[in-house]
């Protein structure tokens, strides 16, 4: 096999896994992003066959949703009728409907019926029935087909070894003992050590002795010796990637970060399949490496007896052709189809409830009060309740925009030598922005910073050193024990004290930004912006939300951040549009750009007239405690000062209302809360708290339109809200950019929550309380599990038996005439594919308020 061919096959196979970002820069991703050319239904069926993974909501989730009024029976009947209309069958429609109605109750077939001698005898007598068309062939890793003498599946043995080697190579925690020859790449480092691995038997090490030094050659040789034909190689590689999707996803992400590691996924598969050969060689050759999943007709007959109300006597009296038709129909109307129809009914119910809510609260666009301040928030669903309460309590107008404010920047905070790409992970930064201050202030700040850093560094060094780690528990035990007790039993007081101490010690001096373009910089990313770029980014963001006239005296750009303690998933609660970081930096940079005279003059020449007394400021919305923290307030005009004072005066009430609404949704908060803000701070500071906030759980829709469309709507913190005025977008470019950027981020977030809810054992990350942070990369259950790719149980579940997140595919609602939607679908093939294949849902609201499902 040629090397180019194996490279192409690995690239094609990689579609079955998604890149996995390190947990401390957590970026939402949906696990099927490489499979969107297939329909959601096709992927669901394939995963069920290949990995026995269900990606439709379970029967218990569906029954619970129906009991809560989240699913209307009429929509289920409509879905069933559509499905029956799409099928070709030769049994009476009434009989088929009766069978389907009974099966849709999602009851399990009684085990007594399945094991009944009478039913099994019927099945034996029907051996003439041809079930070949019902069978599915799945290419499984050979190791998964073999059990050792200890009754241990060899795929588990293989996974144990691969996890060990992945941890060694990928370790980012700064271990003192690193993997030898790591700089030569994963495969070469593994090859250097594998023949000394005591965990392998002598015969297994012998197989790998003198193994090829080149990863591509080794992979091709291993596949050849395993007897995998060229036509089955891609399917075989996919099976191996799906065996440990977390570690494979991390490998794939790393391969995309640098040229030096671009072949890392090939190296991973070379290591994995070479080790598989060594482990399974004593059992070769196998008679049949392709697993034929034979269809048992026992449950098909039992389903007609139980749901079709057919007796065994009636079955025996049927002609063979009729029996075949009934079996084929029962096979087609399988559990996946039944749950698919329920999911569609659930989604249609949600869409209808949202339509009614929007229609009942729409107000005339000319019914406007005097606006004292305008505040732009991230589209994040957690902004919706905060915006709603803010608008109710004061003369304010709010906007929704992606929380990076359209700035493709990498941020470098004061005193830091590193930068963070503060934009959606689907984009690459084009500018580096540094936080600056004068030299004396910088030295003083860095000295204070070094004190804390040196303590942490000393502790880490002692922990990782063989000798000092023995003494560390005795030395640090009393202090850490005291910290554990105080942070668990008096979290708010201790947390507040630590925050004040940190603020005093690490109080930043007044800072500016490197906004002006620096020529001939050594880094890959240029520092600052040219004048044209400054104007372009400001114009673009103002136009995208429709804020090009009627500016209020104070315009506040609000990034957002979360606040939690002892939480490995802290980055998952930060701003997704800022790559898993707080959005305050971007908000401050954007507000600063808007205040520059050169920017305002250029915008004025283009017809965007920002009044002289309009001032842009920046703040950060703390989502865990629903507070607004000011991070940039320049000198204010008289009217802007009035607006600022008004915001300050009502903010405690806004926080109380928003916190009360949010906290009552948490488990164990059914009683009345006396002081919601204090309770929220306790959750944020308690390091034993496994659920400081719900994050983006229950997200279900992405609404693109003017604020009037949803103003006064209680959207329950379930909607991403992005401002959009179609009247200012004749070309449709603004809408296309919203769909391609924020729309994609929202879809990824939505499907990550979906996957973590419906398949928590495979796409989630299990129970937070039993997780281990591993190699500075992510979490595992214990020390020998997959690198867990999704969200923890506590992010999507109310209890062990009740979900909190409703697993619905994202509904994108666009306020625009139908021709805008048609143009978008015609021009954007990727988005059209997502809609057609069921990865997102799409609806529109035209200028007359008419709702249309696409």
Curated annotation (Swiss-Prot):
Coiled coil: none annotated. Signal peptide: none annotated. Its main location: membrane. It is a peripheral membrane protein. One of its GO terms (cellular component) is plasma membrane. GO terms for molecular function: zinc ion binding. The keyword Metal-binding applies. Its cofactor is Zn(2+). Pfam families: DabA (PF10070). Keywords: Cell membrane, Membrane, Metal-binding, Transport, Zinc. It is found in: Cell membrane. Zn(2+) binds at residues 378, 380, 560, 575. Belongs to the inorganic carbon transporter (TC 9.A.2) DabA family. Part of an energy-coupled inorganic carbon pump. Forms a complex with DabB. This is Probable inorganic carbon transporter subunit DabA. The gene is dabA.
